[in-house]
Amino acid sequence: MKIKQELLQACIDYANKRIFNYKTEIETIKESIESNDKAGDDDDDSGNGKLFNDLEKNSQHLGDANKMLEILKNISPNSVSDKVIVGSAVKTTTNNFFISVSAGKIDIEDGSYFAISHLSPIGMLLMGKSQGDAIEFNGNKFTIKEVI
């Protein structure tokens, strides 16, 4: 269970960092928009247009990061299953995976894991599989050694 707790915490830290960064960027953009408005430069709206686009993009990314955090909050590191489910740590003959959210490579004491969404192509292949099952991804075959 320690493995899953470490992986889950790393993913939560990743999501919280993204949320913090997007909130900071949104505040910076809002300040720039206010600054432009106070300058009274009515002739040039292109600067604000770009800022509004950036604001919208960052707001969408913030929403995605918040959804990511909600998914993580619903994962119990103490759950046990013989089959791959959301929250499983999966060791294979080639790579190790943590089925959660797409958060990239995570290095913990037990080794390196890739945090992937269950909706990702490889996540969908792994879901429901058990120890000893083999899957093929991008022309590479590998076998599940352990589901934690």
Q: Locations of the language-model features?
A:
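Conserved hydrophobic positions within beta-strands
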Residues: 144-148
